[in-house]
Swiss-Prot record:
Organism: Gossypium barbadense (Sea Island cotton)
Entries under PANTHER family matching the protein: CHLOROPLAST 50S RIBOSOMAL PROTEIN L22-RELATED (PTHR13501), LARGE RIBOSOMAL SUBUNIT PROTEIN UL22M (PTHR13501:SF10)
Entry-linked HAMAP family: Ribosomal_uL22_B
Coiled coil stretches, renumbered: none
A Pfam family assignment: Ribosomal_L22
Protein's recorded name: Large ribosomal subunit protein uL22c
Entry-linked CDD domains: Ribosomal_L22 (cd00336)
Gene symbol of the encoding locus: rpl22
PROSITE patterns named among the record's database cross-references: RIBOSOMAL_L22
Primary site of residence: plastid
Amino acid sequence: MIKIKKHRRNPYTTSDEVYALGQHICMSAHKARRIIDQIRGRSYEETLMILELMPYRACYPILKLVYSAAANARHNRGFNEASLIISQVAVNEGTTLKRLNPRARGRSYLIKRPTCHITIALKDLEFEPLDRYMLRPKPKNTGWLGWLKKG
């Protein structure tokens, strides 16, 4: 099972990136990086073609994350999927699951199942930031002596 976590962002932000984070994926980070290096900087459609045709087991969870990030872009920000590119991709090592394999004469061998965390950021090439009039300026923090400066 892949746990997909979505970053909560301000809907009025001027950022043109949308994220999807997959945590505790049962595979080595080294094997996931082999796939990630092939798709970094490519368009969304080209990435889907590459991931569907590559013969590696690591392609399936990465493909699900790319689909999830594109769904986030379409639903949350209203981006067009044809203009999305993969801007940032990161693979970090997760926790290692440790299991015992029983052996002869009461011994046991340790089995280590590595996990990894994959973050995918999609960027829209046709994104136009909001007008500066729509974004409210932050109020000035005058501190507790602000009333002295008024008079």
